[in-house]
Amino acid sequence: MRTELTPIEARVIGCLIEKEVTTPDQYPLSLNALTNACNQKSNREPVMSLSESEVLDAVDQLISRRLVSDESGFNSRVSKYQHRFCNTEFGDLKLSAQEKGIVCCMLLRGPQTPGELRTRTNRLATFADVKEVETVLDKLASEERGQLVVKLPIEPGKRESRYMHQFCGEVDLDAFQGSALMTASSTPQFDDERVAHLEAEVEALKQELAELKSLVNSLL
């Protein structure tokens, strides 16, 4: 059975997976670090402004469902959290590095094209080309894998369909189709992969700067 998350729970899980891969020396995360990650302005859609209390409520719910664990030591005054969302010893959800990168990016940014996913997962996984991303997406969308992601109707003026995870409930394809039909058909076309690549470069720089500032502040 597929895990069903609230939007805040999805953000928490996405952040824990991201930091596990990109900053392993700072993982597991304290509540403060996790809240900062949830509210990060780069590589997040939508940008949130959550309080520590809201994040802690989500963490407590995830702990009760065994999707997050508190890894703080016996005498530690600060709780540290890590996800148990996938690839745990007794869990059902097993993801390859590429699948994990794609799911993480979707939890953090919602619907995206294969081109966008290829560039935005550059710190999470390696893909030779967009075709390889599409192959992994097809596997995740298969009934055999429980349809973890779904292909959305192509938007007017776009060349690629977007894909969305279904960990926050089954996606209403009719609603997306209706939204696409309401969009002006004269929307200019863009090279999705090139735009996504430029966005990813800017966001990676922003994220590295934010992490550097956080590290400097922790040393002061």
Curated annotation (Swiss-Prot):
InterPro entries: DUF480 (IPR007432), WH-like_DNA-bd_sf (IPR036388), WH_DNA-bd_sf (IPR036390). Belongs to the UPF0502 family. It comes from Vibrio vulnificus (strain CMCP6). PANTHER family: UPF0502 PROTEIN YCEH (PTHR38768:SF1). This is UPF0502 protein VV2_0756. The lineage of its organism: Bacteria, Pseudomonadati, Pseudomonadota, Gammaproteobacteria, Vibrionales. It comes from the Bacteria.
